[in-house]
Amino acid sequence: GDSESEGTWERLFKRLRDRGLRGVELITSDHHHGLVKALRRQFQGAAWQRCQTHLMRNVLGQTPRHLKAEMAAWLRRIFRSESKAEARQAFGELAGELDGKAESALQTLEAGLEDAIAVLALPAKYRRRLRTTNMVERLIEEIRRRERVIRIFPNSASAHRLVGALLQEQHEEWLTGRKYFDMSEYFEWKQARRASSG
């Protein structure tokens, strides 16, 4: 619908930037064309990571039933590769193995492969958590769970207050609780890369 349009995403990202969002280097999301176009325009220079879970579902949905287990094993191997080159090599082996048996699935995977392995450019420590949208999906599930308890909101402002309170609660958890990941090593890695290339 309209809530998924390029213009809607563009306005949202512009508002986030206007409110001070800076230093975006990697964005993990589903593959909605409008979303991806808006991301690339508003966060130029940031890498885009296509959610591997969503791509895997798309590929498996186009895979013949008798090949699904084999395809799933190949996808796990590709997505858990140590490097982009290794992932590409594994895809080449898969394409040779299933040539003529799962063409639609292979075409979908080939079209999305580079975007789904963008995370392999990062240090291994960060890949598992950044390769999917699981963190955001869990947050959305929690919002929906709490919303179902209330069931009927008297007005949209009350719904916004609930969502705002839940997001604030999650923000505080990220600040004070167990860290989802520590970015200090990432910034050291980035600085070392900059020094070696400059």
Residue ranges of predicted features:
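A general structural motif
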Residues: 22-24
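Acidic/histidine-rich catalytic cores and adjacent linkers
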Residues: 77-198
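Active-site beta-loop-alpha junctions of metal-dependent nucleic acid enzymes
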Residues: 1-20
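Alpha-helical elements of the RecA-like P-loop NTPase motor core of helicases
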Residues: 7, 33-37, 107
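Conserved beta-strand -> loop -> alpha-helix junction used to position metal-binding or nucleic-acid-contacting
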Residues: 26-33, 38-76
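A generic short alpha-helical patch detector that favors 3-5-residue windows
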Residues: 1-5, 27, 48-51, 63-67, ...
